[in-house]
């Protein structure tokens, strides 16, 4: 059975978000096409996603020195445990669907924090004599991103840092089979917003058949 993580990073629901509407349309179609698969929703705004901070570095330092989990402070234990949960869930999945908005040329900070939780040496990638090697080969990912302007092509494509960063991190951990759906231009062309949304939903439903 294939396990799919539906990873969202938007405080708004599908009623208030173009990206979430497309994301939910995709996952509904995916479930219809693949009823045997398991879909797990991870709402990053309602999930504990520790940032790498002094507590985390201190905990890693203790582990490197051979000290056990019991030697950590309560705060360190809570953060490390949450990070380990996020990491294990990510490693045990086969497909990833990220749904994010663009905020000032990138995605919400919680997405970066989540990627810091799952891009871990010795777990999702390893160092070799020839450089780092991803350990999650054979998995697939989809990124659905909503942007007010047009960033998938043209002059602004270079500043689509969220899309580029996510693709880079996924490739780094071995997930090189990636798809992308742009839900874009709604603010630049408000009179076409509904048309843009409907076209993206149709694209998402079609992709769900072969994802």
From Swiss-Prot:
Keyword rRNA processing: no
EC class: oxidoreductase
GO molecular function, one term: electron transfer activity
Record: residues binding FMN: 102-105
Cofactor note: Binds 1 FMN per subunit.
Function according to Swiss-Prot or TrEMBL: Quinone reductase that provides resistance to thiol-specific stress caused by electrophilic quinones. Also exhibits azoreductase activity. Catalyzes the reductive cleavage of the azo bond in aromatic azo compounds to the corresponding amines.
NCBIfam families according to UniProt: PRK13556.1
Family as reported in the entry's similarity comment: Belongs to the azoreductase type 1 family.
Name by which UniProt lists this protein: FMN-dependent NADH:quinone oxidoreductase 3
């Amino acid at each position: 059975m294939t396990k799919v993580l539906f990873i969202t990073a938007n405080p708004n629901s599908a009623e208030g978000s173009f990206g979430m509407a497309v994301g939910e349309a995709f996952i509904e179609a995916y479930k219809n096409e693949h009823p045997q698969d398991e879909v797990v929703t991870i709402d990053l705004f309602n999930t504990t996603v520790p940032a790498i901070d002094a507590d985390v570095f201190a905990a890693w330092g203790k582990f490197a020195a051979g000290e056990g989990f019991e030697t950590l402070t309560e705060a360190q234990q809570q953060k490390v445990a949450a990070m380990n949960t996020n990491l294990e869930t990510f490693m045990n999945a086969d497909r990833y669907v990220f749904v994010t908005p663009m905020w000032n040329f990138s995605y919400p900070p919680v997405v970066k924090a989540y990627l810091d939780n799952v891009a871990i040496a010795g777990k999702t990638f390893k160092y070799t004599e020839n450089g780092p090697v991803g350990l999650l080969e054979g998995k697939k990912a989809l990124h659905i991103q909503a942007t007010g302007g047009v960033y998938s092509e043209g002059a602004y494509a270079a500043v689509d840092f969220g899309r580029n960063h996510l693709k880079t991190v996924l490739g780094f951990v071995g997930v090189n089979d990636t798809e992308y759906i742009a839900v874009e231009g709604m603010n630049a062309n408000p009179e076409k917003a509904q048309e843009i949304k409907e076209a993206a939903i149709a694209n998402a439903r079609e992709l769900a058949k072969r994802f």
